[in-house]
Every structure is written in C-alpha cells, then in structure tokens.
Amino acid sequence: MINSSDFSRSSAQIIKYPIITDKATRLLENNQYSFVVDRYSNKITIKSAIEYLFNVKVIKINTCRLPRKQKRVGKYVGWKPQYKKAIVTLSEGDIINLFTDS
C-alpha cells in the first residue's frame, strides 16, 4: 500500500542523483542504472518516479540502505549520513542519457 505522503512528494525529491562509479558504469552494459534515492521511498515510488522523469519502462529495482559511516576531523568525531541506493533495470531498447553529448 502506498502512503498518501508518497503522492505529495515530487519525483525530483525521490531521485536525488545518479551514481557514477566503476561498478555503475559496468552495469550500464546490462541496461542497469544506479541512483541515490530518498531513504524513506519504496520500490513502487522509485519506479513511478524513474518512469515519469525519464520516460522509460522499468523492469526491476534492487534497493539497499547503506549504513552511516564515522568521519573524523582531528579530535572531533562525526557521522556521514545513511543513504539508500537503487539499481534500476530498464527494458530492452530504453536508455537514460547520463552523459551529455557535446
């Protein structure tokens, strides 16, 4: 069941930014894209946001919540925030242009 608060959030607030790492670029060959998403969003809202923003068909979504990490600056100890990552598999023929063509 989808909460009514999920409908009120815009798609741009759910999808924060794409992940560009070595592993993420290898996954592009399999038509899989990685995004950092809102911690409290679920797979249904992520799917609808991706389909709305990029006009593509989503087949599968894998999500994981990564733990917060300790960060140290001198004698002071702080924490990097916890975040959620989504790996989105698109249907055959659909692409998301992450790199601009110049």
UniProtKB/Swiss-Prot annotation:
The keyword Translocase is annotated on this UniProt entry: no
Keyword Ubl conjugation: no
PROSITE patterns: RIBOSOMAL_L23
A single BP term in Gene Ontology: translation
Chief location: plastid
GO annotations of cellular component type: chloroplast; ribonucleoprotein complex; ribosome
GO molecular function: rRNA binding; structural constituent of ribosome
Compartment(s) where it occurs, according to its Swiss-Prot or TrEMBL record: Plastid, Chloroplast
Keywords: Chloroplast, Plastid, Ribonucleoprotein, Ribosomal protein, RNA-binding, rRNA-binding
One of the Pfam families matching this protein, by short name: Ribosomal_L23
Summary of the function given for this chain in its UniProt record: Binds to 23S rRNA.
Subunit structure: Part of the 50S ribosomal subunit.
Matching PANTHER family: 60S RIBOSOMAL PROTEIN L23A
Family of the protein in this entry: Belongs to the universal ribosomal protein uL23 family.
Protein's UniProt name: Large ribosomal subunit protein uL23c
Protein's organism: Phaeodactylum tricornutum (strain CCAP 1055/1)
Source lineage: Eukaryota, Sar, Stramenopiles, Ochrophyta, Bacillariophyta
